[in-house]
C-alpha cells in the first residue's frame, strides 16, 4: 500500500519506464521539466511536437523519418504492452503501440498519450537531456504532457 506514497516511495521493481527528476538547464538553454520520463537504462524519452497524436479514431502520424530517425530513434514497443512494468505514478492505459515503416522494415514504436516516443542519439549517459528543446522536441513530464485518447 506504500507504492507511490507521497510521490516519493515506490516498491523496488524491474520497471521498464521511470520518472526521473532534474532541475538544471539543457545545453540549448531550454528549461528542463522537473520530472521527466526515462527508460530502465536512464535514457530520456522525448516526443516530437510536429507529430500528430493518436485519437480514439486515428493512428498517430509521425513527422520523423529517415535522417530524423537516425538522430531520434524510435523507442521500440515491447512484444506485449501488458509487460510494461510501471511505477504507480504512470498508467498503462496512457501507453500504446504505433506500427511504422522505417527503411522498409516494420517497427512497433511505443506511444504515450497518443504521441510516438523517441530517444536522442547523443543522450547516451543516464540522465542526459541534450534533446530537450523548447518547442520541437520535449522530454516528457508525465503530469504535464497533453492528455489524448489513444
Model-predicted segments: where are they?
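Compact beta-sheet-dominated domain cores in extracellular/mature segments
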Residues: 1-150
Amino acid at each position: 500500500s506504500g507504492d507511490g506514497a507521497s510521490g516519493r516511495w515506490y516498491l523496488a521493481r524491474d520497471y521498464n519506464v521511470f520518472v526521473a527528476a532534474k532541475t538544471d538547464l539543457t545545453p540549448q538553454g531550454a528549461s528542463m521539466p522537473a520530472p521527466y520520463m526515462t527508460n530502465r537504462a536512464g535514457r530520456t524519452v522525448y516526443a516530437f511536437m510536429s507529430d500528430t497524436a493518436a485519437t480514439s479514431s486515428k493512428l498517430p502520424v509521425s513527422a520523423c523519418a529517415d535522417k530524423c530517425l537516425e538522430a531520434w530513434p524510435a523507442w521500440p514497443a515491447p512484444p506485449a504492452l501488458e509487460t510494461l512494468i510501471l511505477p504507480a505514478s504512470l498508467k498503462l492505459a496512457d501507453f500504446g503501440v504505433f506500427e511504422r515503416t522505417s527503411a522498409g522494415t516494420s517497427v512497433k514504436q511505443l506511444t504515450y498519450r497518443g504521441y510516438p516516443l523517441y530517444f536522442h542519439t547523443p543522450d547516451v549517459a543516464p540522465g542526459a537531456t541534450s534533446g530537450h528543446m523548447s518547442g520541437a522536441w520535449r522530454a516528457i513530464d508525465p503530469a504535464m504532457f497533453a492528455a489524448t485518447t489513444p
